[in-house]
Design a protein with these regions (language model features):
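Conserved catalytic core of nucleotide polymerization and phosphodiester-bond processing enzymes
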Residues: 1
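Exposed alpha-helical structural elements
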Residues: 106-109, 118-121, 125, 162, ...
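Short hydrophobic beta-strand segments
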Residues: 4-10, 25-31, 72-81, 206-208
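Gly/His-enriched, cation/cofactor- and phosphate-binding structural elements
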Residues: 17-42, 48, 166-348
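Short alpha-helices
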Residues: 49-154
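Intrinsic-disorder/low-complexity, polar/charged segments
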Residues: 10-16, 82-84, 152, 304-311
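Hydrophobic, aromatic-enriched interface-forming segments
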Residues: 122-197
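A short, well-structured beta->alpha microelement
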Residues: 5-24, 58-65
Length: 348
């Protein structure tokens, strides 16, 4: 693939995506979902998050018949972010799957939908592939771009393709060193993620991180159990990710109730809206919300307010003057919430 055969643009927000057609034609759209709204291409679309795309494969597994169809020279491919599924989807559209093992793409789809904590379920050679990729993508020069405008990322995607050519030994015997680097990275990353831990109970773990992905760190060495939920605040991207290990929490529903319809993801893993800057206050609000949801999945009661309310997750702005006091009372990370026999919630 030559870098200018097509143009690949990263469009990070819904607002920009709604305007993009005024600047260029979106011939193909891959992972262009922004909460509850999606941009679709004039020739090709590969989305799979929203209910309207239920049952659709991830971009990395979307069938593409390049024998009878291909993008024209100079076509524009639009993406909303750069991750493994997105990159593989672009590669498929460009006819670059021929050296990628089908098994790798199948697992990439599963991981994208269910979270990377499931990687241990797959054979050792598959774990080696993914650890090599994660190690490479964690290098400063390869980290995902954080942009606020429509950005040409053609050269960046080309660099990913070159990495996969090396990993899967297309041109030279470079795979063994990459595999070994991945194994070393995987060994080191567990210690590093634990150093980012803010607090934990047997049910959830909370992390503050900068670069290290902590969303799959369910296992607690302290409790010797697998927590149900991980909440991770990334200070580099000013974003929050919520993931669930057992399906007991709908992460996508949670983040959308916290931050509105532009937040998105899957039931098993979801995050704050792209382009939205969140802070530690929002992290604590997320933790507090999960505590309440664990006690009352449908009815929410504010411990700092007399009476009940059906919490719409925006009441701190519009309805409840006691909400900030309520949130601040949970700022002490060791605090817990207990439901009394009367049904009242009490902060301990």
């Amino acid at each position: 693939m030559t870098q200018r055969t097509v143009n690949i643009y990263l469009v990070p927000t819904k607002e920009l995506a709604q305007q993009v057609s005024f600047q260029l034609e979106p011939h193909a759209c891959i992972e262009t979902e922004y909460g509850d709204w999606a941009l679709e291409g004039t020739m090709f679309t590969a989305n799979h998050h929203l209910p309207k795309y239920a049952g659709y494969p991830a971009p990395c597994m979307t069938p593409i018949n390049l024998t009878n169809w291909c993008l024209p020279m100079g076509a524009n491919i639009i993406i909303s972010h750069i991750d493994l599924d997105t990159v593989l989807g672009v590669m498929g559209l460009l006819g670059e799957w021929y050296f990628i093992p089908l098994e790798f793409r199948e697992v990439a789809e599963f991981i994208d939908t269910n979270g990377p904590h499931h990687i241990h379920k797959f054979p050792a050679h598959v774990q080696d592939w993914f650890n090599a990729y994660w190690a490479w993508s964690a290098l400063p020069e390869n980290r995902a771009l954080r942009v606020t405008e429509i950005t040409d990322v053609t050269a960046t995607i080309h660099k990913y393709i070159q990495f996969f050519e090396l990993l899967f030994d297309l041109y030279a015997h470079n795979s063994p060193p990459l595999i070994e680097e991945g194994r070393v990275w995987a060994s080191n990353i567990q210690c590093e993620t634990e150093s980012k831990l803010l607090m934990e109970t047997e049910n959830y773990r909370v992390f503050r991180t900068d670069r290290v992905f902590c969303g799959a760190s369910y296992y607690s060495p302290t409790h010797k159990t697998i927590a149900k939920v991980v909440i991770s605040f990334n200070t580099n991207f000013n974003s929050i990710t919520v993931s669930c290990s057992d399906g007991s929490l709908d992460c996508r529903a949670l983040v959308q109730r916290l931050w509105g319809p532009t937040a998105g993801g899957h039931k098993g893993i979801a995050g704050s809206p792209r382009g939205k800057i969140v802070d530690e206050y929002e992290l604590k609000r997320a933790v507090y919300t999960i505590k309440l949801m664990a006690i009352r999945p449908n009815l929410y009661m504010c411990p700092a307010y007399t009476g009940e309310c059906y919490w719409d997750f925006n009441c701190y702005q519009d309805y409840c003057p006691a909400y900030r006091k309520c949130i601040e009372s949970v700022f002490e990370w060791g605090g817990t919430i207990k439901m009394l026999p009367t049904g009242e919630l009490k902060l301990l």
